[in-house]
Amino acid sequence: MLFSSSPIRRRTFSCMRGNLTIRGTEYRPNGEKLPIAIVCHGFMANQQTVRQYTSVLAKIGYCAYCFDFCGGSVPPLGRSDGATTDMSVLTEVQDSEAVIRYAQSLPYTGDTLLLMGCSQGGMVSALTAAKHPDAVDRLVLFYPAFCIPDDARAGHMMMAHFDPQNLPEKIHCGPMPLGRCYPEAVIHMDVFREITPYTGRVLIVHGTADGIVKPNYAKKAAEAYA
């Protein structure tokens, strides 16, 4: 695709996941039946950290969306509803599904769907694609945090430390308190088995000097997708 010279319209949007409001930003070029791109931010982050991707995707013809996960940002950076203690990778999959449904309901979007995610958002995007393999045309993963299940089993997730055999109700993780549901959702997960139902196009980008998510997780994912 070539960069479009047409103006990009930017607007805020909201949609619902149960009784929680998800808030985000749409970047829309001119046209009809536009392909959709959903971009997911990482742990403790917010939509601001991935807006550069949505902007570029809109310039090459996508109707692109970024949003704040419910409870997925360091307070008060996130604009969506929800407590950080109620957030998990699986609730973020549900958020992604809600944004996809919203985007697909609009009169100017088509059937083509690209999912993109960074770090934890990469794992969320991969799990979402695995749940909807026929709906997702392309999957782009930047340093996807497939380490999260292993970290939960080891009892350390970023700044959080806990006994994996006796999960506490509340977990201290620097400026972002987590709930028991965060490790509980993934502690028994075989993530590389979970992602393999998706057989479409996948691009994985991962720096070899990453000290948080080791690049061998990206290599394992590439092998799982092969």
Give each language-model segment a name.
Residues 131-178:
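Hydrolase active-site cap/lid region
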